[in-house]
Amino acid sequence: MTDKVKFSSYVNENFKSTLNKLAKNKSKADNSYHTKYITVNDYLNNFSEKTLTDVCNSVLKLKYNCDHLTPIILPKTNCLKHDFMTVDNTRLVCVPSVQDRILQKLFLEYLKEHYDKIYNRFCEYDHALNKDIHEKVVDTLDEAGKPIKKTIYGIRKALDDVTEYRSKYKYVIKADIVKFFDNINREIAVKKFEREFIGLNEDKELIAIFKSFVYCDAKLDYGDLKYKKLIEIYLEELRGKGVRQGMPIASLCSSMYLYEFDNLIIKNSIPYIRYADDFLVFSNSYDTAKKLKNHVQKNLKKIDLDIEKLVGEQKTRIYGAKDNFTYLGFDIIYNSRLQSYQRQIPRPVFDKAIGRIDSFQSMTKVKRECGNYVDFSLYLRILISGYTNFYSEDLATNGEEFKRDLIAASKNVRKKLITDNLNIDFENIGSANKRMFFFGIK
């Protein structure tokens, strides 16, 4: 543990540089999740010393309140193209505001710097948090196709480890903790953080800001209007409980809950990969795999968690050597031609994403759901950026194809709207008029 400065002072020193780092990621700096969402670039353009002073003072006075989260519906791999989207075949991800995202990032960095031993102990086996603890150097190609070495961590390392372990072990147990984040007790999470991290230090700033993060909820009006009823069901069910996925601190909460379980697995030298609450256990024997599955379930029940649902299809399964399965939203498949394992974006994700774009077949629907054509173009950009941010090109062999198909679908549906609904020959529209029609740019 290093000599501590107050968290409010740490925020004052590092907020602007963290904001600038976010802005340097040009592919995401203009991402918007609803019409009122303030993007990274918007926030940066309006940033001032007064903004920073107000943030720091609210942290110092223990009065910082998070903005509402933005609820986003993502289809699970079992959600097929024409399926009606429900809580069973989708997941809710909640995106914090730019300001709150920066504060949560700084909060985690502050813990790593000033409570490093405690932080590392909790996060050692969670790939969502152990960036500075476990890194991996892999061979890859640069943009010119030249072989280079690249250091990976986080979800990239977790997925790379999966393909590596898959080639070493015949069986894998894919464990799914039933509604893990939704079942986190907020009060217990805050008390555990206070006990494990703060102890006798009485760091009230950290406790107050952590509580603000944990108790933050999503706002229905910020969600996609097309899925308003589904989002409403989610938010009503989760009201006042759990920690929302999509927040940087969610993984810290999961690691605090699973700390004892991690140690039990590692202590027994069991091959194990965990990213937040999603984990895999490997074995070269089917009998051993069955015993490990029972071992996992027994020990999770000790902390009021389970990998078996009371009703419905069970998601925790044992997979054989060449069986395909999905992990962290990506298909892990065996390529018989290359005799190796690869990661791919599941086909149902293609179908569902393109289906959402193709559903706009009339200007009536555009006006009803988006208001006007300019906002419709913004809606498509938000939709595509949401998908491609998660299913990025560097994580899947078909990532580039996925992005290309979404962009093509977006162009085609707008072209069709012009041709079919306005009786205008798209090919005869000049480029300036296309810009005006698509984007409202003169």
Please name every model-derived segment.
Residues 285-307, 335-336, 340-341:
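Helical (often loop-to-helix) elements that flank the catalytic cores of nucleotide-handling enzymes
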Residues 104, 108-185:
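Active-site-proximal segment of RNA-dependent polymerases
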Residues 70-102, 119-151, 228-253:
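Short, conserved non-catalytic motifs in the polymerase core
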Residues 97, 101, 105, 234, ...:
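Right-hand nucleic-acid polymerase module
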Residues 56-85, 208-231:
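Reverse-transcriptase-like RNA-dependent polymerase core
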